[in-house]
């Protein structure tokens, strides 16, 4: 939280605190790419999309706009699809097996939909990547077709009854 300029949180920032099933050290959104295939223990997994932060993070940590800060900074994490099931142990290393789209980092993907002005070439790039989740490709197609980005406010801030007042 210090790097983001936030005061001490309501809950501890530790592995699984953000609702993730897997946590690791060292690999960032600026390094990991959509479509990356990793061997993790006996499992084979693939990065399918950036994580879309939601208002539940605001509630858990006591910051009214933590989800927005995460989205704006691109520090959201990512989702993995399982290509091959297998046992995974806490000591297993994440081994990169394939990187089909080195030009499409998780951060760049998130920035295209969340943080930059509409750019047809970038939206088309998302549509052309079958490893990107169908949901994210749908968002890109909608923005490309209708010229309007999705309204993220409900996801980021939640229903009115869940919104926290800003911290002073």
Regions found by a protein language model. Give the residues of each.
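Metal-cofactor-dependent catalytic cores
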Residues: 1-168
């Amino acid at each position: 939280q210090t790097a983001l300029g936030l005061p001490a949180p309501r809950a501890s920032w530790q592995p699984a605190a953000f609702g993730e099933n897997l946590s690791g050290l060292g690999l960032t959104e600026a390094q990991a790419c959509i479509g990356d295939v990793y061997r993790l223990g006996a499992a084979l997994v693939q990065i399918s999309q950036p994580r879309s932060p939601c208002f539940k993070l605001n509630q858990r940590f006591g910051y009214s706009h933590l989800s927005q800060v995460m989205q704006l900074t691109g520090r959201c994490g990512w989702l993995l699809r399982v290509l091959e099931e297998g046992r995974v142990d806490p000591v297993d290393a994440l081994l990169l097996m394939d990187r089909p789209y080195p030009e499409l980092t998780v951060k760049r993907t998130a920035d295209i939909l969340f943080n930059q002005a509409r750019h047809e070439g970038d939206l088309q790039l998302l549509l052309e990547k079958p490893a990107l989740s169908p949901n994210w490709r749908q968002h890109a197609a909608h923005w490309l077709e209708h010229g309007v980005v999705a309204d993220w406010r409900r996801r980021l801030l939640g229903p009115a009854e869940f919104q926290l007042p800003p911290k002073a």
